[in-house]
Amino acid sequence: MTLFLTSSPCDNNVPEGLDLPCIFDACNGFVENLRASVEPGAQLLIIASDPDAFAGNDEMAATFEGCFAAAEIELEDVCVLDSRNADDAAELVAQSGVILLSGGHVPTENAFFASMDLRNLLADFDGVIIGISAGSMNCADTVYAQPEEPGEAVDPDYQRFISGLGLTTRNILPHYNQVKDNVLDGLRLFEDITAADSAGHTFYILPDGSYILARDGDEMLCGEAWLMHNGVLEKLTEDGEELTL
């Protein structure tokens, strides 16, 4: 299995003439590494974060089909996995060469994954998995579901650590440049909430365009990143750099 744990792999600077909302971001070798990993003619399975958001899921599938085409990565077919065909999850996973785990609300996506027993379905998967945002977060063995929606930071019943897909031990926190100054329920997202939750835990904090590439037991951090552990935030890498984990 080859695993890409991304914040967002999307670049909104679309070349003239392409009718797409975004293309894959070539920064930090992402497109090059993806091309080298995907078998030509593979089937792409996009697993939704919200299983009932049919229109949005179909729109996302069309967008990423275009992203692969723009990156000159040949696909045989593109399929969405949501509540319309969740009963066929095992078959769809088995016939896919590339699986994309969508971004969205971490607990919502996590519950959908669990309802299909996706952790076991992916245990022997030998293709390429691309996590995006929440999808990357849910790849962890134990997921840190950083509070995101109003009320979650002060809800004593909100579960911040939940069982994930077990594809990595790394906890990813995405979109750092966009959310680093956010305030949720009167608390600063990183200084007040995440720093306290990092006691005994390690979080890899990524801006869009950065990712972790895991293959054959090796893990490489590609692009700018920070690490938070026991309440301390430190810069790990700059954009364009790589770090073996």
Task: Give names to the regions the model predicted.
Residues 1-40, 58, 62, 145, ...:
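C-terminal and late-domain segments of enzyme folds
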Residues 16-92:
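ATP/NTP phosphate-donor binding region
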Residues 96:
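An anion/phosphate-binding loop that grips the pyrophosphate of nucleotide cofactors and donors
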